[in-house]
Amino acid sequence: MSRAGEAVGLLEVYGLVTAFAAADAACKAANVTIESFDKNKPANAESLEIPLLVLVKLRGSIADIKAAMEAGEKAATAMGGVLSRHIIARPEADTEKMLKISAFA
């Protein structure tokens, strides 16, 4: 089932285990699906306690995304931490294309 056009939640966290914990908490808290994960090793990775950033991309209604992001952020904060978060209520067509990209694929 395609959820294109629905709201998107973006939660960037430190570490893969933190990303899985955040995604799990988000999916349990609301009717959302995981669009994809993406990863990034920052230029200053050697100076970071956790040298990997993971972006969790979630899909659902705006109300569900808000609830899911809150739960995911809470779970991630208790572990490796959250770098940034953002909600896109109605993604534009070109943004939709970018949401499909994943470094894990």
Language-model features and meaning:
Residues 1-53, 57-105:
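Long, contiguous binding/interaction regions
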